[in-house]
A protein has these predicted regions:
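Short beta-strands within extracellular/lumenal beta-sheet-rich domains
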Residues: 71-85
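Short, surface-exposed beta-strand/strand-loop-strand elements in extracellular ectodomains
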Residues: 104-121
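A short beta-strand element within beta-rich, extracytoplasmic domains
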Residues: 88-102
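Short, surface-exposed tryptophan/glycine-enriched loops
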Residues: 126-158
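C-terminal segment of classical bacterial N-terminal signal peptides
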Residues: 16-24
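Internal, hydrophobic beta-strand segments that form the core of beta-sheet-rich folds
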Residues: 154-171
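N-terminal leader/pro-regions and domain N-caps
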Residues: 24-68
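Proprotein-processing/basic-patch segments
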Residues: 168-194
Length: 194
């Protein structure tokens, strides 16, 4: 190969490389979700919420979502969201973090939850209610649910809802959250192009 051929080859590769690099960078960019303020009721409160770096994950920090000595407390959370145009919600992962104290000889504690979607941006929940029973103490438990959304809609606004309750038996305790207020519930959305 002579110097002229090498120069032409180098020029062609440089031009092609310059065109491919921005294209590759643009295709790797992830779509982001806009989250509204999380609202909780009747017997819990949202202390804070944090959007993850991927803009598809929302961490919700609670206050007073606990039950002890035979109590049952419920917490209903609603979050308005905007799904970007050209995308639909495919799957979701919801991670609960908490602690429970279950002395030997007691009936234990439980965490129950179900999910609802309001509006076309999410479609229909394809998941049944879940209950996790704890029969021993655990300073930091993690329970993760994976749910599928069946949406024909492409982008738009919607509301994601969690209906959760914690149940204790006499002499037991359960809380969603931890003393250092690390994230209690993390909600992650997987999106698909439509």
């Amino acid at each position: 190969m002579n110097f002229k051929q090498f120069g032409v080859l180098l020029s062609v590769s440089t031009v092609l490389g310059m065109n491919l690099i921005p294209t590759k960078a643009l295709t790797q960019e992830e779509a982001s979700i806009k989250f509204g303020q999380a609202i909780a009721s009747p017997r819990c409160a949202v202390v804070d919420q944090l959007v993850g770096e991927d803009a598809r994950t929302l961490s919700v920090l609670f206050d007073n979502f606990e039950a002890k000595d035979g109590e049952r407390k419920s917490c209903n959370v609603r979050v308005n969201t905007t799904i970007p145009s050209g995308y639909r919600v495919k799957d979701m992962r919801i991670l609960y973090q908490g602690s429970t104290e279950v002395p030997s000889g007691t009936k234990g504690t439980s965490l129950s939850r179900s999910y609802i979607f309001n509006s076309g941006a999410f479609g229909i929940v394809k998941d049944s209610p879940k209950t996790t029973k704890f029969t021993s103490s655990n300073e930091l438990f993690q329970e993760q649910d994976e749910i599928t959304a069946a949406s024909a809609s492409c982008g738009g606004e919607g509301q994601f809802g969690i209906n959760a309750s914690v149940q204790s038996s006499p002499e037991t305790y359960i809380a969603i959250g931890s003393p250092d207020f690390t994230s209690e519930v993390k909600i992650h959305f997987d999106l698909a192009r439509c």
